[in-house]
């Protein structure tokens, strides 16, 4: 198995441009061997910048309170569940503001999307701008592979930015000196440039067979992203073609037979195999397209940056007094095996079996229950899927005092109907154990360890192609793709007559929970409804002119997410969203620092009234140009 070796990664020092003076002694000279002039002279130098792009992309999922949490809670599938904090993202209109601290400890990392995006763009643009500084004689394929990967990284970032923030600054070249003159650029033209770049990349980026390493960008990853961009542009035939380039490449196939470390264990199944971290990078896993690779040897990135996914998305089941027995005693503890609680050692190791969660990503009742329509669906069956009733009361004090509820299943209510869980938001919900359980042998209270994570997977490619067919009113083809994913999980196929966007989004939620950037994808679909004017499954039509006040993203969230629909009360806030939050606010810090240009603010936020017409990208020589509309 080949993995990207990014041990001891040398972070590059980007030199500023030199002075205009002509005296030779005033010309800046690199003070380091690793200055750009010395680094970007061959494939190894350019790949070092691309490795930095991969590293920054991985940061979305890894560490505590990863930015990805925001993609979950600004959607129909989940809400922020840490009820013991202030400043968290529950009452969205009150806290989602341009000058709010969006990168704050264990409260939120939403702001990382803006800063990390432009870091990745910086690294990609260095490669793009300097690619021909090297001698590529007899190495044209290597040059084009590297350039194509840089185009991929830049396009991937902008695909996310335009569905999080809308119109944003579009930077197409290496910035070699201070600049304060950026302007917002139209989402549509940014996507057009991304499409052009990805079409180049789809031609030249290597396949795995041609030498692409596990964890690096390959041709299939390019075509997968190109499919999303084609959808976003409303170019549905092109989306089908780019999805076909992955699905029909002869290499990638949905996994339907057991494989990996537990393939002979009859208590598990193909769904379990597919999501075990030790199986994701295996050669026989033909469903993997692009994988974030993580191991304890990657010390250059900080050993603490584990995939702390159980901490984020498993309930806070072991909190003190969170789940009481019918006899009124503390029922559960997340202390490890042998640790004393109340003077007695823990004998039932729940934390080792399920992980220590804090309930930050709290799935909605719809995701837990209403979404699932087939009892044979492996994704919603034990032991892949866990309910709180699968846990038992393990507090050793119960055993020591002869309490009859020791080792009995945890209960939500007592015989009289009284609640036994003191925090039903944070400490009581179901979860997809098969996907979220990532062991950490170095931690006796594991909350997620060093593990690989899917960035792109073939199941999503099928669902993207199904979506393109739906936009073209080809329900027969859409049903075939949805059912390919669905029947692999043991669920019955949908009849063609029942298939629509609601069904498609439901299947995405079942298959891609904590994989897809749910907010981004819902916003992309909202834009398509506004652009095409097609009638939605909810009976509504949408327009671009009213996007900030009436859009599909908001309607979908209100339809499926009872917390936002009913303004559920938490200890410090009510859960609320608003239509304009379909786009996040451009940070005030970015706007204020840009004193010689103008960054527009989105509707609904302070500063919107000072907006000016955004610029647009037009095709032309080199990277094209950013011009006034």
Protein language model regions, located:
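Bacterial Sec-dependent N-terminal signal peptides
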Residues: 17-41, 155, 194, 227, ...
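Long, intrinsically disordered, low-complexity segments
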Residues: 21-25, 117-120, 193-195, 263-338, ...
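Conserved, well-structured interaction surfaces
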Residues: 38-51, 55-66, 84-165, 185-189, ...
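C-terminal substrate/ligand-recognition segments
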Residues: 351-485
């Amino acid at each position: 198995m080949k993995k990207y070796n990014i041990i001891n990664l040398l972070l590059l020092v980007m030199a500023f441009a030199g002075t205009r003076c002509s005296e030779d002694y005033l010309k800046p000279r690199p003070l380091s061997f690793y200055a750009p002039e010395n680094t970007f002279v061959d494939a190894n130098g350019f790949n070092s910048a691309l490795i930095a792009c991969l590293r920054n992309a991985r940061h979305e999922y890894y560490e505590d309170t990863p930015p990805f949490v925001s993609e979950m809670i600004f959607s129909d599938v989940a809400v922020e569940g840490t009820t013991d904090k202030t400043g968290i993202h529950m009452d969205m209109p009150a806290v989602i503001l341009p000058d709010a601290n969006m990168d704050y400890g264990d409260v939120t990392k939403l702001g990382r999307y803006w800063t990390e995006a432009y870091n990745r763009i910086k690294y990609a643009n260095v490669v793009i701008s300097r690619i021909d500084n090297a001698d590529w004689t007899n190495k044209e394929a290597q040059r084009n592979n590297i350039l194509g990967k840089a185009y991929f990284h830049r396009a991937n970032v902008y695909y996310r930015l335009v569905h999080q923030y809308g119109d944003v600054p579009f930077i197409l070249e290496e910035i070699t000196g201070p600049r304060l003159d950026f302007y917002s650029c139209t989402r549509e033209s940014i996507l057009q440039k991304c499409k052009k770049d990805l079409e180049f990349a789809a031609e030249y980026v290597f396949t795995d067979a041609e030498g692409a390493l596990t964890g690096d960008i390959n041709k299939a990853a390019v075509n997968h992203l190109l499919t999303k961009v084609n959808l976003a542009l409303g170019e549905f035939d092109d989306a089908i073609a780019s999805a076909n380039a992955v699905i029909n490449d002869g290499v990638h196939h949905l996994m339907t037979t057991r494989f990996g470390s537990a393939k002979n264990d009859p208590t598990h199944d193909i769904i379990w195999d597919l999501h075990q971290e030790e199986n994701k990078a295996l050669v026989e896993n033909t469903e993997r397209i692009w994988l974030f690779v993580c191991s304890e040897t990657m010390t250059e990135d900080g050993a603490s940056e584990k995939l702390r996914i159980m901490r984020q998305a498993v309930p806070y089941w072991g909190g003190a007094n969170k789940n009481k027995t019918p006899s009124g005693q503390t029922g559960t503890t997340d202390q490890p095996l042998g640790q004393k609680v109340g003077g007695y050692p823990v004998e039932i190791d729940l934390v080792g079996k399920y992980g220590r969660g804090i309930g930050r990503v709290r799935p909605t009742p719809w995701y837990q229950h209403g979404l699932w329509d087939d009892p044979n669906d492996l994704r919603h069956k034990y032991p892949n899927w866990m309910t709180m009733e699968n846990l038992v009361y393990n507090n050793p004090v119960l055993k020591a005092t002869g309490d009859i509820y020791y080792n009995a299943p945890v209960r939500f209510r007592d015989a009289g109907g009284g609640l036994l869980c003191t925090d039903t938001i944070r400490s009581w919900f179901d979860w997809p154990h098969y996907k979220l359980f990532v062991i950490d042998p170095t931690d006796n209270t594991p909350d997620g360890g060093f593990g690989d994570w899917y960035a792109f997977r073939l199941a999503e490619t099928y669902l993207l192609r199904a979506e393109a067919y739906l936009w073209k009113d080809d329900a027969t083809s859409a049903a075939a793709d949805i059912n390919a994913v669905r029947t692999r999980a043991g669920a019955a196929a949908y009849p063609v007559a029942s298939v629509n966007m609601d069904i498609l989004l439901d299947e995405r939620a079942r298959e891609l929970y904590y994989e897809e950037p749910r907010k981004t994808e819902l916003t992309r679909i909202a834009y398509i409804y506004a652009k095409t004017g097609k009638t939605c499954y909810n009976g509504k039509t949408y327009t671009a002119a009213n996007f900030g006040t009436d859009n599909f993203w908001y309607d979908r969230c209100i339809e499926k997410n009872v917390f936002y629909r009913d303004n559920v009360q938490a200890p410090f806030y009510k859960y609320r969203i608003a239509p304009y939050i379909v786009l996040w606010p451009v940070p005030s810090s970015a706007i204020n620092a840009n004193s010689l240009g103008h960054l527009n603010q989105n509707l609904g936020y302070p500063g919107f009234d000072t907006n000016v017409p955004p610029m647009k990208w037009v095709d032309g020589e080199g990277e094209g140009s950013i011009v006034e509309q």
